[in-house]
Structure formats: C-alpha cells, structure tokens
Design a protein with these regions (language model features):
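Flavin-dependent oxidoreductase catalytic cores
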Residues: 1-382
Length: 382
C-alpha cells in the first residue's frame, strides 16, 4: 500500500509537551514538499490544503505558552529509499558510492530545468500553507545530504548549466528557494535554514563554500541559520567520528559557528551534542551561537528546558544505547528506533521509558514499518 503521508493525529500532544516544557522554539521533523519523493517512512507531505485542519491543530498545540513552532520543509533528492519511491531525482544522475547504500536507493535521474523551477515553486507553496495553518515560521532543510544539500555539493552536482559547476552556480537553487519562500510568506514571517558546515567527504561541500552560502543568505535577510553537518554517507549529524576535544566541548559544530559569527550577524543555532547547562551557557557566553539546539535531551525529558531556565545545574541523561552485540551497536538505526519509540510514547501521553532495551526497540520498529524501510530511517541529530 502507498505510504500514509497525512499528518497523524498525535503530533499536537507531542509538541504540546515540549511547549509546556519550556522550549522557546520547536522545529518540526522534515515535512516533504512532494508526495512523489519521500525520505523516510511516515513522512508528512504538505503540497495542498487537504489536511489543513490537522495542521492547524498541530500548530495550535505547538505554540502553547508562547512557543514558536516552525515547520521544517524538505525534498530528499536521491536520499529517497527505493522501498518508498518509484524513482528518485537529483541535480545529476550520480548514484551513491557506498555499496551498502546502493542496495536501498535507485540511481537518480537528473532534474530538468523545468522540474527545478517546479521544485522552487513547491517550496514556496509548502511554506505559504504552513503559514496559513498557523505555524510561526519555516525552516529550509539544506543539510544532511537532502536535495538542497545535493545542489550545493560538487560531489553530487555535476551539472553544466546555470545550476552547476562553480560554487556560485551550485548555490543558485537554495537562493531561488529562499527568494520564492520569502515572496510567498512576506517579510515578517521567520524563514530559516538548516545548513551543513561541510559534507565531510572527499570532493564534497566544504566549509569555505558553506560560509559563502551563509553570506549570500545573510545578504538576502534570512532570519536564522541552524548549523549541522554530514550526509547518509558521512553521518556527522549523529555524532559519529567526532574528536574527543569536540565531545568535551559538547557541541559538534561550534568551531564552524565561530567562523560564521566572524563574517555575519544573522542569528545562529548550533544543534548536536549539548548535554549540560554548563556547556550550553559557555557556548552562549562565548558568542559562538545565539540559540541552543536540543533533540535527544528533549526526548528523554520534555521539560528539560524548564529545568535549564530555572537555573538548575541540569545534565541530560542521554547516553549511547548498547546491546553488547557489536554489529547491532554499530548500526545507527538502533538508536533511531529507540528514540522513535520514546517519541511515540510522549505522543500517546506516556512518559519516556529510559530503561527500554535497544534491541527490543529495533525489532519493534522493524515490525511496525518493515525491515527494509527501517534500514533507511533517518539519522537524527543528537
């Protein structure tokens, strides 16, 4: 059967828990702009007004107590599993080089110029619908190897037209997406982007190129930049491959944020690795970031933000999920499954179950959505 792409009835309860827990800005999981291109099982798709009532309920719940709720909008490009999609598209017909990934993805078809224009339009349409539904902002997903990230990367974008070649041409797509969203939502509606600091791959998107994108978006008036990094092939967004010095400092991408801050004044958010009030306060006091992005700590404790704001010397209990079976422990999908089930518990009005087993969580999620689909479940930041 085709995947269910409607907003489920339970996000209001989940996002209400975070709003009541003191979080000032919640950014949704990625909402897709085209139901023909799904990145993960159960993606919500917003391309028309058919589910506006559910979206309005979601927005109302997530905005309780003055919380901002921004919709993250996305297109997966070639990171669209074959189990969910008949074909995949990308800037160029470049397949994954990793043989483990090749088994789960089609070789992508290169987008035509007309199709690129349609995707730009779709980003704008989804943003306008999010505003109509009551969300207080939107975020372009320009990181983690999805379509916007693919256009930016010379490893994946080998076009020879106005959208490829030079770094300036490769950032044309993201700038057109931003301009179209801004045109549709107006100047007073927050628009942000989640952007890779780098792809961490040979021949990929570099830090210097990323800084140039930041400067171009800043000149256009973007409201917030969230810094992340990595792709399916080099998943730094999950904390893999980080140096010990980086782990001690907590935030994965703080050094890059300091470079950004030296060039632009746009507000920055760093997500990934923050665990303690002390580490967050240090990052803010250093001026490297303006907002602290949290993910896994808010799954274990939806009220963690309230504890921080109350002045408690709070440290999140986030820790690696281990079974003792090396092959299982090295698979990022086990931790993704574990946190997915905790989110489902919160959405049902239950407390997170911190002592839930990793292997049992993996098997349960595999049973619910199918093993093949699970294999390509998204790696989530921290």
């Amino acid at each position: 059967p085709p995947p269910n792409t409607r907003p489920p009835p339970n996000p209001p309860r989940l996002y209400r828990a975070w709003a009541r827990g003191g979080t000032g800005l919640s950014v949704t999981g990625n909402v897709m702009i085209d139901r023909r291109a799904l990145g993960e099982p159960c993606n919500v798709v917003l391309e028309d007004r058919r589910d506006l009532d559910r979206l309005k309920a979601w927005a109302r719940a997530g905005r309780e107590d003055g919380t901002h709720l921004w919709m993250q909008i996305n297109h997966p490009g070639k990171q669209a599993p074959a189990a969910l999609n008949r074909e995949t598209v990308s800037p160029s017909a470049v397949p994954f080089s990793d043989p483990n990934l090749k088994r789960f993805f089609h070789v992508p078809r290169a987008l035509t110029v007309d199709e690129i224009a349609d995707l730009v339009r779709r980003f704008g349409e989804t943003a306008a619908l999010a505003k109509e539904a009551g969300f207080s902002g939107v975020q372009i997903h320009g990181a983690h190897g999805y379509l916007v990230s693919q256009f930016l990367s010379p490893r994946h974008n080998r076009r020879e037209d106005a959208y490829g070649g030079s770094a300036e041409n490769r950032r044309r797509f993201v700038l057109e997406v931003y301009d179209e969203i801004r045109r549709r939502v107006g100047d007073d509606f927050p628009v942000s982007i989640k952007l890779n600091s780098a792809d961490f791959q040979k021949g990929g998107f570099t830090e210097e190129e990323s800084l140039a994108v930041v400067e171009a978006l800043d000149a256009r008036g973007i409201d917030l930049i969230e810094i992340s990094g990595g792709t399916y092939e080099a998943p730094r967004m999950a904390g893999q491959g980080q140096r010990e010095s980086t782990r001690r400092r907590e935030a994965y991408f703080l050094s890059y944020a300091e470079q950004v801050r030296s060039r632009v004044k746009v507000p920055l958010m760093v997500t990934g690795g923050f665990r303690s009030r002390e580490g967050m306060a240090a990052a803010l006091e250093d001026g490297a970031t303006d907002l602290i992005g949290l993910a896994r700590p808010l799954v274990l404790d939806p009220a963690f933000s309230n504890r921080l704001l109350a002045g408690e010397d709070a440290v999140s209990a986030v820790a690696p999920i281990r079974t003792g079976i090396r092959a299982v422990d090295n698979a990022a999908m086990m931790e993704v499954s574990w946190y997915t089930l905790q989110l489902a518990r919160i959405a049902r009005g239950k407390a997170p179950l911190a002592d839930a087993g990793g292997l049992s969580s993996l098997l349960k999620v595999a049973g619910l959505i199918g093993w093949r689909r699970l294999r390509m479940g998204r790696l989530r930041a921290s």
